[in-house]
UniProtKB/Swiss-Prot annotation:
It comes from the Bacteria. This is Pyridoxal 5'-phosphate synthase subunit PdxS. It comes from Haemophilus influenzae (strain ATCC 51907 / DSM 11121 / KW20 / Rd). CDD domains: pdxS (cd04727). D-ribose 5-phosphate binds at D23, G152, G213, G234, S235. It holds the Pfam family SOR_SNZ. Its EC number is 4.3.3.6. It catalyses: aldehydo-D-ribose 5-phosphate + D-glyceraldehyde 3-phosphate + L-glutamine = pyridoxal 5'-phosphate + L-glutamate + phosphate + 3 H2O + H(+).
Length: 291
């Protein structure tokens, strides 16, 4: 990928900053998400909660279903590919998807290698649970990073852990001397230029969203206050009692994340949140995929 194309892709991802990206399974849900103010939608045949419940191998969604969602909304549409499955990515690029998420939510196709994202024109989103993972994905050509969390649980604890971990490691890099950055880059297994960027700017070179377990407006505001630049909401909306109201409330929470009065108002009368699964009740399946 030409350097100027990558810069363009990073800028495209920056345009989603401060927004909410919602998992949708059909055109009707996509229209609900768009009406609620979503910045983009993620087209998925099965949302993470269902993938977790059913088990088995989960793959890229049917291109026909993705195209139906593309035709239903005017906001950007994303879709997921398996880690390392560059042919699934080629297919999504062929149907002119707006963003590709190389996702640990699906069953990995390759246990060692990720997709070479520089081979594609479409911007890629990747998950990371610490600074090393984030910078390695960026070195491969990712235009956007999100926390991995533990999708499909409705439990925010993993996303919080990953965001705090990333922030702590960024602060550690900032406190290093210039001549210590080379060793840090070697330890993180990334080009020194990326570590130098973090040292100078105190943040990732690409936009950084939160994902995994976000189920309430308060969850979304929590992740924003911890440093996220936007949020992904998967199972939390359409597994809840009142998806339309909850979707709108989460969008408002991301915009007003530092205003407790507004957060209190929009948290009222949302119907039942998704039941969720406590992290202590499950085996951590997805967050450990793709390091």
């Amino acid at each position: 990928m030409a350097e100027n194309r990558y810069e363009l892709n990073k800028n495209l991802a920056q345009m989603l900053k401060g927004g909410v990206i919602m998992d949708v399974q059909n055109p009707e849900q996509a229209r609900i998400a768009e009406a609620a103010g979503a910045a983009a939608v993620m087209a998925l045949e099965r949302i993470p909660a269902d993938i977790r419940a059913v088990g088995g191998v989960s793959r890229m969604s049917d291109p026909k279903m993705i195209k139906e969602i593309q035709g239903a909304v005017s906001i950007p549409v994303m879709a997921k590919v398996r880690i390392g499955h560059f042919v699934e990515a080629q297919i999504l690029e062929a149907i002119e998807i707006d963003y590709i998420d190389e996702s640990e939510v699906l069953s990995p196709a390759d246990n060692r290698f990720h997709v070479d994202k520089k081979e594609f024109q479409v911007p890629f989103v990747c998950g990371a649970k610490d600074l090393g993972e984030a910078l390695r994905r960026i070195a491969e050509g990712a235009s956007m990073i999100r926390t991995k969390g533990e999708p499909g649980t409705g439990d925010i604890v993993q996303a919080v852990r990953h965001m705090r971990m990333m922030s702590q490691e960024i602060r550690r890099i900032q406190n290093l001397r210039e001549d210590e950055l080379y060793v840090a880059a070697k330890d993180l297994q990334v080009p020194v230029e990326l570590v130098q960027y973090v040292h100078k700017h105190g943040k990732l070179p690409v936009v950084n969203f939160a994902a995994g377990g976000i189920a309430t407006p308060a969850d979304a505001a929590l992740m924003m206050q911890l440093g996220a630049e936007g949020v992904f909401v998967g199972s939390g909306i359409f597994k809840s009692g009142d998806p339309i109201k909850r979707a709108s409330a989460i969008v408002k929470a991301v915009t007003n994340y530092r205003n407790p009065q507004i957060l209190a108002q929009i948290s009222e009368d949302l119907g039942e949140a998704m039941v969720g699964i406590n992290e202590n009740e499950i085996q951590i399946l997805m967050a450990e995929r793709g390091k």
